Amino acid sequence: MADHLMLAEGYRLVQRPPSAAAAHGPHALRTLPPYAGPGLDSGLRPRGAPLGPPPPRQPGALAYGAFGPPSSFQPFPAVPPPAAGIAHLQPVATPYPGRAAAPPNAPGGPPGPQPAPSAAAPPPPAHALGGMDAELIDEEALTSLELELGLHRVRELPELFLGQSEFDCFSDLGSAPPAGSVSC
């Protein structure tokens, strides 16, 4: 139950003798909560000086009252939940060009992942183009995109290399660059 919560708030469960419940008159049951059993009052009393002699204490009941430690209360789950999937870690490119990374599980290197004995081998990494991660695109997807955009009717498509040279002013104008200038 919530015995540990009641103790944290300063309450304890007190049992009253049956004759004390009858001394309050016929309307005493109206003030009782619906879960109170025979011989129990409201069940919760603020801690204070005990009215009678203290009950005998047991060694394990000091922190939890007469009920002992809560058996069903666990602050953390005993068993971690099963993982939704298995993640495969792959080594990353070296942070500094020209310097090789230490192999996994080597001294000074990162600890490598330990695959499960029944797990299949991870798929090979995608090929990188120009040192950047690239995702290969299916030829059928490109063909359907070409048809959808109407590019199949165009005889010659301009080459687009954004970020490398958006415009080359000297090749467009057909003249040589002035001496001592830097080309775009």
Curated annotation (Swiss-Prot):
Record-given protein name = Cbp/p300-interacting transactivator 4
Q: Which GO terms describe its cellular component?
A: cytoplasm; nucleoplasm; nucleus
Assembly and oligomerization: Interacts via its C-terminal region with the CH1 domain of CREBBP and EP300. Interacts with all TFAP2/AP-2 isoforms.
Biological process per Gene Ontology, one example term: response to estrogen
Q: Which Pfam families match?
A: CITED
Report which gene this protein is encoded by: CITED4
Where is this chain compositionally biased, Low complexity type?
18-28
Q: Which PANTHER family match?
A: CBP_P300-INTERACTING TRANSACTIVATOR 4, MELANOCYTE SPECIFIC GENE RELATED CITED
Q: Where are the residues of the annotated region Disordered?
A: 18-67, 94-128
Q: Which organism is it from?
A: Homo sapiens
